[in-house]
Amino acid sequence: MSNVKNLAKKAKIAARTLSVLDTEAKNSALEAIASQLLADKETILQANGKDLDNGKKMGLSPSLLDRLALTSARIDGMVEGIKQVVELEDPVGQVMETWQRPNGLEIAKVRVPMGVIGMVYEARPNVTVDTCALCLKAGSAVVLRGSSSALNSNRALVSAIKKGLAKTAIPEDTVQFVDSEDRGAVDEMLRLNGLLDLVIPRGGAGLIRRVVENATVPVIETGVGNCHVYVDVDADPGMALEILLNAKCQRYGVCNAAESLLVHEGIAANWLPGAVQELNTRGVEIRGCSKVVEILSGVKKAEDSDWATEFLSPVLAIKVVKDFQDALDHIQQYSSGHSESIVTNNQNTAAEFLRQVDAAAVYHNASTRFTDGFEYGFGAEIGISTQKLHARGPMGLRELTSYKYVVKGTGQVRP
């Protein structure tokens, strides 16, 4: 039996114990993990330092290094995230709906654990902790496979998690870590039908495409974020600028950052120069359509590929659109279905945008950066789904459960 298959088998056995534990036992385990992460903080930071050194030698981009980096504050943030999950309502056992049939059968739809969840992800070590916290609270075991660039960090984090679990009723085997740089381990995970109930990829477009195309285990596709901000002719100029700067510049290397700006031609000449000046002072490279190049000298002409690119860096594609419909058509063609925002004071235009744009999250007069489990009140998230089955948008505890039908009778048989 291969190592990956053996890990999944151990997780499946442990999941049986986890699935029947009550909320108090699960919360106690999460608190123990949080305490152990704080106790092991220096060890974790030292391990992360090795990964950062290796990443710099490998020439990782600044955005990837930012995703990879851990600090004392970021570890504290992980711990705070766990504590928030502790406070969240346990979805397991929740009765979603009930009804009675004419023959007297009482039927209830009840939330149950997923079972064993496989997580394949890149760079971000915080995903290790967020995933474990959410999966354990939702009653599922987890098999983790992070990227080789974060191997030392993930190894230290999983060690702390397992040490925390050793003090609780939850078996250590509920958390398994594929401690290998072999990319073949990912392919093996994707074919573990009967052992893994679900695989969630979280990373760049290449990783997600590879998982979706090769998996025989069910997959929830988390999103590449080619997000747009559309500044309508009826937008408040100051509000539009503030939203744009937040959506693009607050943090470049995240999937809910804006990658394209669409501006109605009715305000482009007056509004764009000031907006681009603000972007330039923050080091953002502009790639514009022909109309943008006419309005602003020195702007790089956008290539067709730029409209479909998730830059994850200080680069922004800007297009002047002739009207609202032109903006909708552009978003329809290039959106990855993650997060899309309109800035306008016209309520009818906003309503049409929110109705017609096909994305996991649509915004009116707000930044795309809010597409996040914490911001939505879910606590830590396992990812942001851009598909429509089984979950969409930020995936919290409820999205990590399934359900079953509990049917009670008094001796009924089918005629």
Swiss-Prot record:
Key words, A-Z: Amino-acid biosynthesis, Cytoplasm, NADP, Oxidoreductase, Proline biosynthesis
Enzyme Commission code: 1.2.1.41
GO terms assigned for molecular function: glutamate-5-semialdehyde dehydrogenase activity; NADP binding
Catalytic activity: L-glutamate 5-semialdehyde + phosphate + NADP(+) = L-glutamyl 5-phosphate + NADPH + H(+)
Subcellular location: Cytoplasm
Domain of life: Bacteria
Pathway: Amino-acid biosynthesis; L-proline biosynthesis; L-glutamate 5-semialdehyde from L-glutamate: step 2/2
GO BP: L-proline biosynthetic process
Primary location group: cytoplasm
InterPro entries: Ald_DH/histidinol_DH, Ald_DH_C, Ald_DH_N, Aldehyde_DH_dom, G-glutamylP_reductase_CS, Glu-5-SA_DH, GPR_dom
Pfam family name, one: Aldedh
CDD domains: ALDH_F18-19_ProA-GPR
GO cellular component, one term: cytoplasm
Function, in words: Catalyzes the NADPH-dependent reduction of L-glutamate 5-phosphate into L-glutamate 5-semialdehyde and phosphate. The product spontaneously undergoes cyclization to form 1-pyrroline-5-carboxylate.
HAMAP family with a match to the protein in the record: ProA
Family membership noted in the UniProt record: Belongs to the gamma-glutamyl phosphate reductase family.
Record protein name field: Gamma-glutamyl phosphate reductase
Source organism of the structure: Desulforamulus reducens (strain ATCC BAA-1160 / DSM 100696 / MI-1)
